Amino acid sequence: MKSTKMTTAQALVKFLDNQYVSFDGKEEKFVHGIFTIFGHGIVVGLGQALDENPRGLKVYQGRNEQGMAHAATAFAKQNNRRKIIACSSSIGPGAANMVTAAATATVNNIPLLLLPGDSFATRQPDPVLQQIEQSYNLGITTNDVFKPVCKYWDRVNRPEQLMSAMINAMRVLTDPAETGAVCIALPQDVQGESFEFPEYFFKKRVHKITRPLAVEEEFYECLNIIKNKKKPIIICGGGVRYSEAGDTLSKFANRFNIPIGETQAGKSSIKSSDLMNLGGIGVTGNLAANIIAKDADLVIGVGTRFSDFTTASKSLFENPDVEFVTINLSKFHASKLDSCKMVGDVKECLEYLYKLLEKENYISSYKDEIKDAKMAWKEEMKKLTNIKYEENFDPIIKFRNKESLEEFKKLTDTTITQTSALGLIRECIDNDAIIVGASGSLPGDLQRMWETESLNSYHMEYGYSCMGYEIAAGFGAKLAEPEKEVYSILGDGSYLMLHSELITSIQENKKVNVLLFDNCGFGCINNLQMSNGIGNLATEFRYRNDETNKLNGKLIPIDFAKAAAGYGLKTYTAKNLEELKNALIDAKKQRVSTLIDIKVLPKTMTDGYESWWHVGLAEVSEKESVNKAFENNKKVLKSARKY
């Protein structure tokens, strides 16, 4: 048996460089690089290995550990989970910074390999810099906090443990049903320790991503339900995207006259113009999809995990005879809502089910309902994209501090409404441009309003809805598809939370366009707060008022364009639609990352359509408005499904 004496870190780099995946006969390299922010717990171990021989791995320099891990997540998502960039950090705060990103990847079922440094396995110098000491367990370190948010976790306390740790890491990372974040903690002394690693550990490994078919019994159980239903609706989830089953789903839906509602993860898997595509469904869904869903007697969940936003907290489907059928690689997700399930690959299962339904001569009983619903939404879209600020302007959102809008208007001199801005952006950017989003009111507006004919051009992280994902993810998406324009669409709140990877985009010459919607606050949470009878507390960006000692002073103005220009971005400020249009046109000509500071009037985002969201309201309050909100919530909850 041949072996090579190497340090643990050197062996790790060599192993990662030899990982490949195969899908539909196409073989691709799996690990394309590694993000790192070197600290004392990683630089002389893994850092030495990468300096001496990085092999085929490109080393990227992050600016914030959470940010670089979000970029890696987006890179994997935009590559349909078949390519990754690993992330390494020092011990302590560097590692802890990646926990949020790990949770984001796991919730969204995106492969993310994290390699945080750790304290000494020998414990000789304990407590080392940045080490947490727990008197009840000296084996606990910061990295233990990754356990709840990862799909696989391991710590390499001896060099030879690296082999089983990495084999299992790859097992999870390349499993479509179980993938998510993987954490392999690397004690800093072990990184530099050597071992005679067998050559077979470094052999080229091709991880086959297969298309398993559900068992025949499951198909026929589902068939017996479907063929007796008159008004089914399909929910298109992220599984459609990752199975590359968009065309198959479109063919299926059009053949059997079944309308489709899109989740955030499923959007852009099929064309917006598809005759059966109603658009976004659920809490952030549009009028067309939610109206059809209310009367549906069958819900066919395809590659979806049925989040509360998709099901409107299980209140959306009001037909008393409604049943659920699912297609999903994950038995866990397929079993939700007492569904009759087909556990298997989306594309393969749809093709098999197509043949069975065709033999039954099945067709839904919809007549003009689908067309009428789409037409009604088309008319609503015209209104939304043409909302203009005028004298005595009344914004879409009615629950508000009436003075805020005029105060913001006076402060910024803007006339831009959020929905009209989105309409203009859609008109101006390339048809195949990738948009990236995650948090605030914009994901709701985008799920409702954004239309695209370009496959996988809608990149929304709405499983964890992580503020700060957008810009880092825009960079990651650009790394994945450098030939396309990428637009990170986010609010001022999210921008302030995390935008450090803009510098990395400059460093790597990978252009990201930032569309920053500034409404001087956390707008969507202000909506949620005030619509449930609560006062306007700490959701607008205001100075502290010396007289009241509360955060109800004047609005805080920020020149985001000026600040970003200091980083080296090409920047613009838009206060009217003409300025926005000119900025969008000019930004396309730039080779460097850009930022458009769009001053948007508060409360001009879209509102909900025929949906409800269950949030934890106070049962008792001195304010009648809060009590009323609780009673309304209680009333809807009675009719919602219990699990």
Swiss-Prot record:
Question: Cofactor note, please?
Answer: Binds 1 Mg(2+) ion per subunit.
Q: At the top level of its lineage, which domain of life is listed?
A: Bacteria
Q: Which pathway does the UniProt entry assign to this protein?
A: Polyol metabolism; myo-inositol degradation into acetyl-CoA; acetyl-CoA from myo-inositol: step 3/7
Name the positions where Mg(2+) binds. D492, N519
Which biological process annotations from GO are given for this protein? inositol catabolic process; isoleucine biosynthetic process; L-valine biosynthetic process
Function, as annotated, reads: Involved in the cleavage of the C1-C2 bond of 3D-(3,5/4)-trihydroxycyclohexane-1,2-dione (THcHDO) to yield 5-deoxy-glucuronate (5DG).
Q: Which family does it belong to?
A: Belongs to the TPP enzyme family.
Name recorded for this polypeptide = 3D-(3,5/4)-trihydroxycyclohexane-1,2-dione hydrolase
- From what organism does this protein derive? Clostridium botulinum (strain Eklund 17B / Type B)
State the organism's lineage. Bacteria, Bacillati, Bacillota, Clostridia, Eubacteriales
